[in-house]
Structures are given as C-alpha cells and as structure tokens.
Amino acid sequence: MKVCNMQKGTLPVSRHHAYDGVVIKRIEKELCKTIKDRDTESKKKAICVIKEATKKAESLRIDAVCDGYQIGIQTAFEHIIDYICEWKLKQNENRRNIEDYITSLLSENLHDERIISTLLEQWLSSLRNTVTELKVVLPKCNLALRKKLELDLHKYRSDVKIILKYSEGNNYIFCSGNQVVEFSPQDVISGVKIELAEKLTKNDKKYFKELAHKKLRQIAEDLLKENPVND
C-alpha cells in the first residue's frame, strides 16, 4: 500500500479566518477586538465623565440656588428696611395728624367759657369767704369770655369785685390777695399728647413686630417655593 504524504496534499495552515464569508487576517481580527475594547472603554469613561459632570452641575445648581436664596433673603431684608422706613414715615405723618387734631380739639374745648368759669368757681370755693376782690387775667384770644365770667361770678359770689386784665399769652390767671392760680391749656394739651404718644408707640411697636415677622415668613416661604433645594 502506498502511503500518501498528507502534508504534501494539504494546504498550509492559514493565518486567515472567515467571518460571514469574508476572510480576515488574524491580526486584523485582533485589531478589531482592540478597537472594540477601546470603544467600550471609551464609552465607560464617557459615562463616568458625564456622571461626574452631571453631579458637579447639580452641585453647582444647588449652590446657585442656595446663593440665590441668600441673595433673596438679603433682598427681603432690604425690602423690610424700606418698608420700615416707609411705615415709620407714614406712622409719623398719621401721628402728627392725630396730634394736630387733638391739639385743635383740646384748644377749642380748653378755652371754652364753661370750663374756665367752672375752674374759677371751684377755686373760689376753696378760698375763705372773706375774699372781696378778684383779679382775673385772660388771654386776648378769648376776649369774649369776659361777659360770661362776670355774669357767672355775679350769680356765684355777688359780693366779690372782679378786676379783669388781658395778656398776650394763652394762660388764665386768678389772683386773690396772696393766692394765685394759673391754668395753662397748653400744659394740659402737652400732657395728653405725651400720653397719646406713649400709647401709640407701644401699640405701633407691637403691631409692627408682628407684621414684620409675618412678612419675613411669607418671603422665606415664597423663596423656597421658587427655589426648591433637593437633598
């Protein structure tokens, strides 16, 4: 039997491989694998970079929101300060109007002939009945009071002689011997205005404190709604 040399009838081992009917050299295959691996690695790195960038962007966004919130709070306080100034100016204007009204009202009433007549009668009743002469100094702004006083005193103490004088001031002065009393409508008005100012100041401070806190809370809530910060 003749032994055939199989090696002679066999093609040498090729370094080529067939993929889908296309012969590809091994080196080309390895190159393709390397490219694929590098592509995969590049994608992984790209994903990491994107994630890191996204994370950083989110951090920056949160920082921006926080910064915006702080700026918002600062702006809110500036608005509050402006509000305080405007409010105080308005309150001062209102207070002046109230004080002017009270001054006008009291000035009319405190110069009323019935009040002066009553004061004079009460003062006379506190003196001894030996009073025979009475000096009364009236402000020129109330000349019309003379006849009223003369009539009232004649009814009350017909035995007392009245000497009337006038002054440029606003006070009423009653004299009998060494006894002197002075009635100042302006002092009464000033006292009432001081008492009123104290009450208004106390109420204003309480009212403003409550209102300011309410406005600050509202501004903070509005800022949080506009700039939500996710943990």
From Swiss-Prot:
UniProt entry keywords in alphabetical sequence: Cytoplasm, Plasmid, Protein transport, Transport, Virulence
GO annotations of cellular component type: cytoplasm
One GO BP annotation of this record: protein transport
Keyword NADP on entry: no
Loss of function: phenotype: Inactivation of the gene abolishes the ability of bacteria to assemble a complete type III secretion apparatus (T3SA) and therefore to secrete the translocon proteins IpaB/SctE and IpaC/SctB, and decreases the amounts of the needle filament proteins MxiH/SctF and MxiI/SctI. Mutant is unable to invade HeLa cells.
Domain of life: Bacteria
Keyword Zinc-finger assigned: no
Main location: cytoplasm
Compartment(s) where it occurs, according to its Swiss-Prot or TrEMBL record: Cytoplasm
Quaternary state and interactors: The core secretion machinery of the T3SS is composed of approximately 20 different proteins, including cytoplasmic components, a base, an export apparatus and a needle. This subunit is part of the cytosolic complex. Interacts directly with Spa47/SctN (T3SS ATPase) and Spa33/SctQ (the major sorting platform component). Homodimer in solution.
Function according to Swiss-Prot or TrEMBL: Component of the type III secretion system (T3SS), also called injectisome, which is used to inject bacterial effector proteins into eukaryotic host cells. Acts as a regulator of the Spa47/SctN ATPase activity. It down-regulates the ATPase activity of the oligomeric Spa47/SctN, while it up-regulates the activity of the monomeric form. Important for translocation of MxiH/SctF, the major needle component.
Name of the featured protein: Type 3 secretion system stator protein
Organism: Shigella flexneri
Gene name per UniProt: sctL
